[in-house]
Amino acid sequence: VGDLHLGGGGLGGVLLTALSPRVTLLVGAGLYLTAAVGARFGLSARPQRASGRPSVAQTWRNNAVLWSSVPRRYVFLALWVPNGLIVGCESLFVSLSPRHAGTLFACAAFGMLLGDIATGRFMPASWRRVLGAPLRLLLAVPYLVFAFHPALPVAALAVMLASIGYAASLLLQERLMALTPNELSGQALGLQSSGTLTMQGVGAVVAGVLAQCFSPSAAMTVMAVASVLVTVSLARGLRPERVESPIETVPVLAPAS
């Protein structure tokens, strides 16, 4: 999903070089509508696993249970905040370099693809236990180079290297599942996804405000520093010894859709 997000961003950057922003937005809206129609008529109905009637109140109760565990809380924050801050950096590619934004988005997508393949397919379990923190730092540290207004090759390399760090999310999701009872695993992933998308939006807004006040390169540097600080502050709670057994819960009713 992340690869497609960034790939779409790269395509948008390419379209901006050939079309007006208005036409590019219309093309994006048309593709979104096509995807919605495909999902509506192309996906088959599946029975829900949870019992009971969907309820917003039950959704919030389940979320409260998920949030009540301190180790799980650290994992959620590590999945949401550093990622969202770096997406704020990516949201400034067009304003940073309208001519080369497509290249930067493409490099970001390529880096994410490399990281996901290497981590998901080839990384042994022993490495997964020790490379989580370095990957989380890799997500942000390369963006510090934008403080020096790098040339395009250096900027593209920095973006590609940083995007490899998105693979840390795979390791954090494994950690989340190890800390979550089976009956809440689906809602845990849903909460993780919702929080991630929310923080990505927040990161883009904050980065945009900073870019308006200063410059895109300065805003990207600030967002990268903030991501590093958040990652370092969460490191203690993400140590392997903090893993605990999933809590016991009462039978879970279906969350609201």
Predicted ranges, named:
Residues 2-14, 91, 197-208:
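Glycine/proline-centered helix-kink
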Residues 59-60, 77, 93-94, 141, ...:
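A general structural signal for well-ordered alpha-helical segments in protein cores
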Residues 45-77, 252-255:
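Juxtamembrane intracellular "pre-TM" segments in multi-pass secondary transporters
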Residues 25, 29-32, 96-257:
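C-terminal transmembrane bundle of multi-pass solute transporters/carriers
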